[in-house]
Amino acid sequence: MSLLIEQARYHLSAHNARQLPDDGGYEVAFAGRSNAGKSSALNALTRQNALARVSKTPGRTQQLVFFQIQPERYLVDLPGYGYAKVPQDLQAHWQAFIDRYFRTREALRGLVVVMDIRHPLKDYDLQMLGYAAERGLPAHGLLTKADKLGRGQQMQTLQKVKKEVTSRFGDSVTVQTYSGESRQGVDELRAIVGAWLGLDVETTAAE
């Protein structure tokens, strides 16, 4: 499964619904606030240094970016949210596009919400988790930059976030700590994403 995920390659960028790939197969979306570490997480997941561009200017992802692993198997990088200097009407366009994507995309099988472990569960994070809950989709909270905290603080934050998401969304949301720098939690994330993409079944059959 890990080797399959490492085959991910840039496929296309969609600025509107007409530019999306055909709605079939399997997609796992990644969402995160600016500077949460979403691009770094995607790069670590796929063992590629520049699959998802790590921007020095937060909030500059202005489209849905599709990375193809196999035909009809995609990782989807959702527009970042933060303090990018863009017009309000463009912000509104992104919001409407994302809303439509979540409500209508049949290929979407799961959502990873990337959060800085030092600043988890902001309004945007809860909104994204809410989208998944409304669709009945599984979601996974990825607490990034775990290496910035000691082990005790990591576990304390992890338990606090787990308790909060369970109270809001039930058992449809799982949570883990993660560090692209130390590769902490990479295998756990791969297992979850691979299962959502149906890669675990194919790998087992091949073995």
Curated annotation (Swiss-Prot):
Necessary cofactors: Mg(2+)
Residues bound to Mg(2+): 39, 61
Domain of life: Bacteria
Keyword Kinase found: no
PROSITE patterns in UniProt: G_ENGB
Keyword Mitochondrion on entry: no
Gene3D superfamilies: P-loop containing nucleotide triphosphate hydrolases
Keywords: Cell cycle, Cell division, GTP-binding, Magnesium, Metal-binding, Nucleotide-binding, Septation
Biological process terms in GO annotation: division septum assembly
GO cellular component, one term: cytosol
All copies of domain EngB-type G, residue ranges: 24-199
GO MF, one annotated term: metal ion binding
Binding site residues for GTP: 32-39, 59-63, 77-80, 144-147, 178-180
NCBIfam families tied to this protein: GTPase_YsxC (TIGR03598)
Entry function: Necessary for normal cell division and for the maintenance of normal septation.
Family under the similarity heading: Belongs to the TRAFAC class TrmE-Era-EngA-EngB-Septin-like GTPase superfamily. EngB GTPase family.
Name of the protein described by the UniProt record: Probable GTP-binding protein EngB
Source species: Xanthomonas euvesicatoria pv. vesicatoria (strain 85-10) (Xanthomonas campestris pv. vesicatoria)
Lineage of producing organism: Bacteria, Pseudomonadati, Pseudomonadota, Gammaproteobacteria, Lysobacterales
Gene name per UniProt: engB
